[in-house]
Amino acid sequence: MNKRKINNKVLLIIDIVLLVISIFTYKYIFEVESLKKIYSEQTSRFIEDNENPVFRIGKIILYSSANAVDKSNGELKDLDISQFTDLEIYIDNKVKSEEITAENTINQMYINNIKIESKNNSGEKILNYKNPLECGKYVELDNWKDDGILFNIINTNEKNEQADYNNSIFYTDCSNPISLGYINKNILIGCEVGEEAGTIVFDGTILKNARIDLEKLEAKISFSINIINNYNEKFVCNLEIENNLESEGEGIYSGYLIKVLNPEEDQYNFIKISD
């Protein structure tokens, strides 16, 4: 009799253990399947959102030249030489819709994850916003701050009337390019240019006169452009731009160099990362 009671207790305990295991197994399987479903839905939505992007980079214009500061009272015996490249980045916000909407207009924009890689450590590498009205001219710039480059968005007539292009501004409808300036400052200090060089102009020709190897000035400029639209949705585009100063002919040695980059379709789409 006692043996039967013990067996019954053992069977009851086994049944309880099996029940608990079954519950946890079902819960695990249910959670895994739920996560799979959520992941699948999110993936499908991500693909759908980015197959027809709201924003993309439509065009990039690079203007490169050089400048020198003469510290020898015009005798060209003590020149500090710098190279600069202006970047005009155009955002196309009419891929998905030709109409101006809350979805394809900008409420906030900033640039971060800025990185400049160069084959040469000479000079101070600087990147920051540049007044677009100064494009093509050498202008001293401060380097970017730790938090990147924050843009003031022009979205009213009043702000438009008060717009100061010396500050980092961008129009909500993407009607102006993102204007940036890159400077490789003081790549050569205390340089003397001989009379055999002839007439000296402080532009890209000064690099040739100073015998500066263009290959050593090549740089890879990369950064992320972050956009928040007027639906409060966030988008990001990671750019990588090669600052190559050579081209057919003399390149920047001829005085200046203009390059127009037309990215391939889907190369620089803004990826939607949050609703």
Enumerate the language-model features and the residues they cover.
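N-terminal Sec-pathway targeting helices
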Residues: 2-18
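Hydrophobic alpha-helical membrane-insertion segments, chiefly the h-region
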Residues: 18-28
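Short, structured surface segments that line ligand/substrate-binding pockets
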Residues: 220-227
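Non-catalytic macromolecular-recognition regions in eukaryotic signaling proteins
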Residues: 29-217, 231-275
